[in-house]
Amino acid sequence: MNPKKKQTFDLCLFSESFQYIPAKIALKKAKGLLNKGGQILVADCFRSDVKHSSHNRRPGGGHPLSEMLKLLKDIDLNIISKKEITKSVAPSLDIEQKFYNVVGVGIDKVQQGLVASHPWKMKLFSLVYKTIVNQKKRRRLHDRIYGNIRNSDNFIKFNHYMIFQLSSNKAD
């Protein structure tokens, strides 16, 4: 949707969507769409500055929080309120990981049954799988289904789940 020329809004809302848009573009566009007294609300995940060295991706996502805070100053947006809810949302990752672990048990059972009943088909499947999916991706998938790396502790370590209420210094 392209707003009509000169159309402004009381609120520009980014809920679980901000991390998918270049931050500078999103904030400048939102600021330009605000009417006098309008606000921007951002509720999303931001990266901490903690370095990550595992072959697995960090749980969570988003723009670095340090860059977001700098950008807010550069674009001249005021922080009306800022709330971190990381510890409140983190337990959902433990539930998600347990689900994947249950899926892993199911895959094991099916695989064992197929190896017993169709060994040559499973060898062929394994060969095709290893040809199509590179080792790094296979390792990540294995760790995702059987491991416990994507958990609440790692989410808290590598992320800040923030709610920002922002306003512009617009004087129109």
Sequence positions of predicted segments:
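A short acidic, Gly/Pro-enriched loop at the edge of an enzyme's catalytic core
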Residues: 2-12
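A short SAM/SAH-binding and catalytic strip from SAM-dependent methyltransferases
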Residues: 10-24
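Short, catalytically relevant binding-site loops at active-site mouths
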Residues: 19, 46-50, 87-89
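A short glycine-rich, Lys/Arg-flanked "PGG" loop and its adjoining helix->strand segment in the class I
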Residues: 24-39
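Conserved beta-strand signature within the Rossmann-like core of class I S-adenosyl-L-methionine
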Residues: 37-45, 49
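Substrate-binding/catalytic lobe of Class I Rossmann-like enzymes that use SAM or dcSAM, i.e.
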Residues: 55-151
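Short Gly/Pro-enriched turn/cap motifs at secondary-structure boundaries
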Residues: 152-156
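Short hydrophobic/aromatic beta-strand or adjacent loop that forms the aromatic wall/cage
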Residues: 157-165
